[in-house]
Regions:
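N-terminal transmembrane-helix/juxtamembrane module of multi-pass inner/ER membrane proteins
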Residues: 1-64, 108-109, 118, 262-274
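Aromatic-anchored segments of alpha-helical transmembrane domains
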Residues: 21-22, 89-95, 161-171, 225-231
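Membrane-interface loops
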Residues: 28-46, 71-166, 190-194, 202, ...
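Membrane-embedded alpha-helical segments of multi-pass membrane proteins
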Residues: 56-64, 133-141, 182-186
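Cysteine-based protein phosphatase catalytic domain of the PTP/DSP
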Residues: 114-121, 295-372, 435-444, 459-501
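Interfacial helix-loop-helix junctions of multi-pass membrane proteins
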Residues: 130, 165-191
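PTP/DSP superfamily signal
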Residues: 199-294, 364-372, 437-441, 452-507
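Intrinsic disorder/low-complexity segments
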Residues: 368-438
Length: 507
């Protein structure tokens, strides 16, 4: 028998509300039993006004919280909403137990409807459970739920303004100190990152690779260093130094990405955009990544043509191309490219076999759809007059014959490793001929265009073109300087090419 949606939603509300009040009350009771509960606030907070009317938006979160259960469309959305609320409750509860704080300021006497709401709040609340503010955490989570539901721009703006007022009200009702707000915002964004309403939840993926743990250790060290600087700076200089803890948090999340979360920690979607929660949490790191890319690319070409119409370079140049294969997890998609494929990878580590295979497949798709099947690419390199092994040529021929049957003619791909000056001139001439036929351009990119994107382009040249690994690598190095690929890449790409040949023969 099918359960009616309303009954399921009501049951979920009752269970989650029971967990909320039970855990919230328990942590309040634990804190009240302590002999000394610290209080953290800044001197300027004494100048904050008390607005009795702001208890209305403060209380409205309770109504919006409950109403959300009945706005869920289907069991899946309800399950996601419930999970987000429970994760939010769990995070807050752990902090309330581990780091209890209090708000000791006495509220002015209030009468009327606002007085009734303050009295109702005092009936079950105590001046503990401060940082991170659970009210602010839920403001982020519930606010994101409603903003996702809203379609009209004016409604989104109105909702955003109201939830911002709810967040502000924790100060103007003397319920919280300022430090509870940024910690609550961070916790709320973390909830949305690990359990998003759309897409797969953030999950662990342990990869036994020394380079990953080396970079994880480096970023974890930076996280501790900046946290220490934040605390020390606040003690001996100014409380504003505490904002360095935001930098610390972003580095810690990146460390988790290298250790066990992978590129998913950036929450970059198929449109090349980071989720708002990831962008907020990782903002300091994202700024550092952009500065780092600008430093290493100063005075250098942002992209180089490898084959006619096919370029390798930095994501900073992506807006100038017709099609883009983006391998940079830490950069968002720039505007301009009409055809876009996102394959987020972490920087400074060798792409895995699955990433290389997926990247080669995506690049093949872009070449076919953008460059008219890629015939000009292959013809231009064939004119270099190079020779490959019989096995490589045989596989290339098989692939070309298959494409002839599917979408028209396609030439054999033949090249030699390091091109001399005569070969470069031949390629230049063929490039001019290709431009007359097709002036569209495809870019394979990452932050700098030296590592991740080069690895994917290598995989495509070997898997789909039939080149040997050394020949493909020499071709890239002759076209773009500073190419940096790990030695382990040879084995991975060679194995993928062998598997592709077996599958091709089987078909």
């Amino acid at each position: 028998m099918k359960t009616k949606p309303f009954l399921l939603q009501l049951a979920a509300l009752v269970v989650v509300a029971a967990i909320f009040y039970a855990s919230y009350g328990a942590t309040n009771t634990l804190a009240s039993a302590r002999a000394n509960v610290p209080e953290i606030y800044f001197a300027w907070e004494r100048a904050l006004p008390f607005w009795a009317w702001s208890i209305v938006p403060y209380w409205s979160l309770n109504l919006l919280y409950a109403l959300g259960f009945f706005l869920c469309k289907g069991a899946r959305e309800l399950a996601r909403y419930v999970t987000q609320l429970l994760v939010a409750q769990m995070i807050a509860t752990l902090f309330f137990i581990a780091f209890p704080l209090q708000m000791s300021w006495e509220k002015p006497a209030v009468s009327g409807f606002s007085g009734f709401l303050f009295s109702s709040l005092a009936a079950f609340d105590l001046p503990f459970n401060q940082a991170p503010s659970l009210h602010v955490i839920l403001c982020v989570v519930v606010g994101a739920f409603y903003l996702r539901k809203a379609r009209a721009v004016w409604l989104k703006a109105a909702l955003a303004a109201w939830f911002a007022l709810i967040g502000l009200s924790v100060l103007t009702t003397y319920q919280h100190h300022f430090i509870d707000i940024p910690t609550g915002l961070a916790a709320g964004c973390f909830v949305l990152l690990v359990r998003p309403m759309d897409g797969a939840p953030l999950s662990f993926a342990i990869v036994r690779e020394a380079a990953r743990y080396k970079w994880a250790a480096l970023y974890l060290g930076l996280a501790f260093l900046t946290l220490f600087a934040a605390i020390l700076g606040a003690k001996i200089w100014n409380s504003w130094a505490l904002w360095l803890s935001w930098v610390s948090l972003s580095f810690a999340l990146v460390a988790c990405g290298y250790a066990f979360l992978g590129a998913r920690v950036f929450a970059k979607n198929e449109r090349g955009k980071h989720a708002a929660a990831a962008k907020a949490l990782l903002f300091p790191y994202l700024c550092v990544a952009r500065l780092n890319a600008s430093f290493w690319l100063r005075g250098r070409r942002l992209a180089d043509e490898i084959l006619p119409g096919l370029y390798l370079g930095s994501v900073k140049e992506a807006g100038k191309f017709d099609a883009v294969l983006d391998c940079a997890a830490e950069f968002e998609r720039p505007g301009g490219a009409q055809i876009y494929a996102s394959l987020p990878m972490l920087d400074m580590i060798t792409p895995g076999a699955d990433e290389l295979r997926h990247g080669a497949d995506e690049l093949e798709r872009l070449v076919k759809t953008t460059l008219g099947g890629g015939e000009n690419l292959l013809q231009s390199v064939a004119k270099l007059g190079s020779n490959f092994s019989a096995e490589a040529n045989g596989y290339a021929n098989e692939r070309n014959l298959k494409f002839h049957r599917q979408a028209g003619s396609r030439a054999n791909l033949q090249t030699r490793g390091t091109a001399n000056e005569g070969e470069k001139q031949t390629l230049a001439n063929s490039n001019e001929q290709a431009a007359e036929v097709n002036d569209k351009k495809v870019l394979v990119c990452c932050a700098l265009g030296y590592g991740r994107s080069a690895s994917v382009l290598l995989a495509w040249l070997v898997i789909y073109g039939g080149l040997g690994f050394d020949e493909a690598l020499d071709l890239l190095k002759s076209r773009r300087e500073k190419i940096a690929v790990a030695s382990s890449l040879r084995e991975r790409i060679t194995r993928l090419a062998a598997e592709a040949r077996v599958n091709s023969k089987a078909e």
